[in-house]
């Protein structure tokens, strides 16, 4: 989207009259909560594995640990990823706050246009031509300033989104070692039906 093509009234209104960052902050809190929950799951899973190592001995426990390794890595990566989502949401919120601070206030833009119209209406003898030109230059500056702010906002948001990686499905546990036989969908449904 080329924000530079929009007049300052549009860009400023989109920032000042928009929904604001509340929904993004709520999303960040939700991701943080999920991160805390999954970190607790990760720690519990690791404790369980350590308990099994203490209780068992021999090649079976080593086989179990090897089978669980991919899932442990996935769980660790998931927690990092959840934390990164929250962090990048806050980056997007900061980008919005900077844009909100730097955007030309709507009142300034409207005052410029209103004053210009008054001068045009009373410029029969050309006595206000210079002032009208000054107001037009100020309006052009508003246009450029708002376009630059929106460009920067877009770049900051794009940068934050680029740091988010696709979600990976959890790997199976113990499938390759045949410690736990894979359950087919038909078997799983028949077990739940009985």
UniProtKB/Swiss-Prot annotation:
Q: What keywords are annotated for this sequence in UniProt?
A: Secreted, Virulence
Q: Which biological processes are named by the entry's GO terms?
A: response to host immune response
Coiled coil ranges: none
Q: Name one Pfam family in it.
A: PPE
Kindly list the GO CC terms recorded for this protein: cell surface; extracellular region
According to the record, mutating residue 127 to I results in: Does not disrupt the interaction with EspG5
* Record text on subunit structure and interactions: Forms a heterodimer with PE25. The dimer forms a 1:1:1 heterotrimeric complex with EspG5. PPE41 interacts directly with EspG5.
Which family does this protein fall into? Belongs to the mycobacterial PPE family.
Outline what the protein does.
Answer: The PE25/PPE41 dimer induces both a strong humoral and cellular immune response. The dimer induces necrosis, but not apoptosis, in mouse macrophage cells. It also induces activation and maturation of mouse dendritic cells and drives Th2-biased immune responses.
The identity of this protein, by name, is PPE family protein PPE41
Q: Which organism is it from?
A: Mycobacterium tuberculosis (strain ATCC 25618 / H37Rv)
Question: Gene encoding it?
Answer: PPE41
């Amino acid at each position: 989207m080329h924000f530079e093509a929009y007049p300052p009234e549009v860009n400023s209104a989109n920032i000042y009259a928009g929904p604001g960052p509340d929904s993004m902050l709520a999303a960040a809190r939700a991701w943080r909560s999920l991160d805390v929950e999954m970190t607790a799951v990760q720690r519990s899973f690791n404790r369980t594995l350590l308990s099994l190592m203490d209780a068992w001995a021999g090649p079976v426990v080593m086989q179990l640990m090897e089978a669980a390794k991919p899932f442990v890595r996935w769980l660790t990566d998931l927690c990092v990823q959840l934390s990164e989502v929250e962090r990048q949401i806050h980056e997007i919120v900061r980008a919005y706050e900077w844009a909100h601070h730097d955007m030309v206030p709507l009142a300034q833009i409207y005052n410029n246009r209103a004053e210009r119209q008054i001068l045009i209406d009373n410029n029969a003898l050309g006595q206000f031509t210079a002032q009208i030109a000054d107001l037009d230059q100020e309006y052009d500056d508003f246009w450029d300033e708002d376009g630059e702010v929106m460009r920067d906002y877009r770049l900051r948001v794009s940068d934050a989104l680029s740091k988010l990686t696709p979600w990976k499905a959890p790997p199976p546990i113990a499938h390759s070692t045949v410690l736990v036989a894979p359950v087919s969908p038909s078997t799983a449904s028949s077990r739940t039906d009985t």
